[in-house]
Amino acid sequence: MKRKKAIAAVMCAVLAVSVSGCSPRKEGTNAPETEKQTGGGQQTESAQRNQETEDSGTKDTEAAEAEQADQTGRTGNSGEDPNTADYEYVQPAGERFDIASYYNELGVDCSFKLRSTGGVVNVPDNYTTELPVPKEKYTVGFSVYYTVDEVGAMILDTMKACAEEAGIELLVNDADYDQDAQNQAIEQWILQDVDGVILAPCDFTGVKESLDSLKKAGIPVITFNPALVSEADSVVMSECKEQGVMAGELLRKYLEDNGTELKGTIVYQSLPFVHPNAATRSDGFKSVFADCPDLDIVELTGTSIEEHYAAFESALMAYPDMIGAFGLYSAATVGMLNAKAANGSGIPITSIDNDKPILQGIYEGNILGSACYSSTAPAFWAMSGMINLLNGVDIPSAYFYENQLVTKENVEEMFEHYYGGKKLKDYMAGEIQ
């Protein structure tokens, strides 16, 4: 599946050009259109931006490689990346992603740095390349923030499957949103002298201890979702502001199509701690309603389905002028969905994430739609990146995976896409879990 959406317009600022230089906005997203880099013919706007960046002298590949070698004891560019055929370059090989500027432009305080200089790429869900072949037997630690929801559980299952396929010894830590537990696991892996670590942070500033220790030990690290502090070799991430915009535009279109005045209250449910994905998703969602002065957007928080249920049930009573709701992640959406049903509410809900109850809610008309992404493809890209890195390849400093808008029109197709060919109707009938 060809990537239909590229990294958000804020990337233009990161690439040292003005926002006005971005491609025209597509309906349903704030992202510019990009094309695969080609060997000849007319330059795309992306290629022109990349050339401007190269010409400006802001990046020095040799200096970057020297710095990387100094920081980790490794050198890049010692081999070709076997996954290149699946990459859509947003920033060319030879450069590193200035992720701190990317997040600062979105209003998130970030000092995180990336060491790899293999550019920035969009990667597909339906990849055509295979896992790289390890040059030797590698031991890799994988710490996942938690596996309570389907996203975390599927990430872990896919990571295990990829490790088994590639012959990687995988050490696993399910941190259950406990940063101290995650730090302790990393400390133990450092003592074991693992070859590399893939890390999905619990606390995006509290993870500094682990990342600093890994750097000091010279152990390569790829983060699954970005940290906000310290540094790593590379990051596998989504363009979360785009997700928020997709969810917001879907809700706004529904309200306008049904003659609802854009006044009153919209509630959205988020997390009670700093999370870069949450901050950028909420920013994207709220930007859709920035021209609605009579509309209040109220944040509610929680970390479980039960907490989000209680918060939404209270909000239904506290805000009689509520016209819509947004679940920023799966537990928030499912909690609101359950509270909506229990209270006989007709409030339209829009969402991010593709857990099975959310897709069922879309099919049944209880959720307008959801900005979704694969929980399996990112694990493949993280493991591929780690193997390539350990093999001596200068990997991309950022892998951006696909966002897809799922509505009632395509929910059955997308259920099969996200769940390995399984059928939504079989899930609803209780024939599959």
What are the roles of these predicted feature ranges?
Residues Y127, P134, V236-G264, T280, ...:
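Hydrophobic alpha-helical segments within soluble ligand-binding/sensing domains
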Residues D98, F204-E242, T265, D355-L368:
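Flexible loop/hinge segments that line or gate small-molecule binding clefts
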Residues T84-F97, S111-T129, T139-T158, C162, ...:
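Extracytoplasmic "Venus flytrap"
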Residues L191, L199-K216, F285, T301-G361:
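Hydrophobic alpha-helical
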Residues V144, M159, A247-C292, I297-E299, ...:
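An alpha-beta-alpha
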Residues G76-Y138, Q269-F273, V288-F289, A377, ...:
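Hinge/cleft segment of the Venus flytrap/periplasmic-binding protein
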Residues V19-A31, G40:
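Bacterial lipoprotein signal-peptidase II cleavage site
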Residues M1-S20:
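Sec-dependent bacterial lipoprotein signal peptides
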